[in-house]
Amino acid sequence: MSNNWKSVRLRLQNRTLVFLLVILSFGSCYSLKSQGDGFLESVTKDLWSDIDAEDLRAVGFHRKLLGRFRNPYTHLNAFRDRPVARATPPSSSVSTRPDAKRSSTLPPPQKSPPAQHVSAPPPFVHHVTLPSLTSSSKTSSNSTIPIVAGCIAGAVFILLLATGVFFFKSKAGKSVNPWRTGLSGQLQKVFITGVPKLKRSEIEAACEDFSNVIGSCPIGTLFKGTLSSGVEIAVASVATASAKEWTNNIEMQFRKKIEMLSKINHKNFVNLLGYCEEEEPFTRILVFEYASNGTVFEHLHYKESEHLDWVMRLRIAMGIAYCLDHMHGLKPPIVHSNLLSSSVQLTEDYAVKIADFNFGYLKGPSETESSTNALIDTNISETTQEDNVHSFGLLLFELMTGKLPESVQKGDSIDTGLAVFLRGKTLREMVDPTIESFDEKIENIGEVIKSCIRADAKQRPIMKEVTGRLREITGLSPDDTIPKLSPLWWAELEVLSTA
């Protein structure tokens, strides 16, 4: 729950940051618009000042003419070129010197017959005084400062936005990194905030009231379910019927198992689709992909099962190797708790799907014989990467020979299997007789087997080295070993729609 809460809190913080950035952006735009309007008003005021109006009134223009000119300077040339009627002014007329001192009123004209003396207005062009450059520059400077400040604020905003996007994107990339293969984008988004939690009623309906039992697994009973879309799923139900038998330690191990399985995410692994936990009735369930072709153990040792030819076995071996190499390469590394041929399942096209249902059952010191054994994950904590390499060597021997690694009783004889191989018998001599033809490089595979099962764990190669060596022998790439149509791609959409 803590991981889910941290993820939700991070998403809320991201959205809050984006909201604040949007508000700041709109505020900056509105501020620039207001400053622009003020700048236009100041420019208009400078171009058409009160002094200009006084000059026009002084030369006799009527006040109503002022409204006709939005900008008088655009009409100067036209006004200057107009012909002016010349009449003889009286001897006492007003001086028309260009440098005459500006006055708010004109001297009173001399009394004379109006019909004989018509005074023409002095040339308006030469008497109009331009607005003060000092005042205009101050106004322009005052108007420019907010614009420059707005531009700087916008640049800082863009820089902060780019930095924030880069930071959160890189941080999100780190959390998504374990999921980058095998899953589609839809399911990745759900897994980032936790594994989908499903309802018991939905799982019960898919499993036909839990009547479709297909086997058992270390944690309990294994059911087959079918979603409403027709996609098949595997359901592992914990064999604990009462909450009294489910301690806090077991609950912690159960959640650790979910966390571990959800991080593997490989196309050659039985991926976890979801889980269910309910108290009434007490339920602890894990939902996985379903591989329809059974296990490798069944195909090797049951006569009624489909025969595996040489190419199939090489593909199975490489699929297991690639998956284990991926698990060991995670940070921190994840090891398989109990790698056996019975834990390797096959899809419809006989691609590998490694399952890991194992928790391990141990009886507590204070428990009675009738009580349910405590479920603790001891195998996972004790198993090492070297153990996985050893188990892979044994499994590879079983694939090539069709024999169990350990000695088993077969009728009146004992099949020692691996012991004979270690005593010097070649793998070619021990190859499964059901294989009609096989590659001449089988002895090279025998060398890989011997290196994996060395008694000294420190002398065993790491899984990456084993995988590289087998790839040189078989020539199979990771894409050659994965299912052509993974059940996960279909199951995930149905799970998401019901989660």
Swiss-Prot record:
The chain crosses the membrane at residues 147-167. Residues 208-474 form the Protein kinase domain. GO terms for molecular function: ATP binding; protein kinase activity. Residues 1-31 form the signal peptide. GO terms for cellular component: plasma membrane. Residues 32-146 are extracellular. Residues 80-121 are annotated as: Disordered. Residues 168-499 are cytoplasmic. Keywords: Cell membrane, Glycoprotein, Membrane, Signal, Transmembrane, Transmembrane helix. It is found in: Cell membrane. Its main location: membrane. It comes from the Eukaryota. It is a single-pass type I membrane protein. This is Probable inactive receptor-like protein kinase At3g56050.
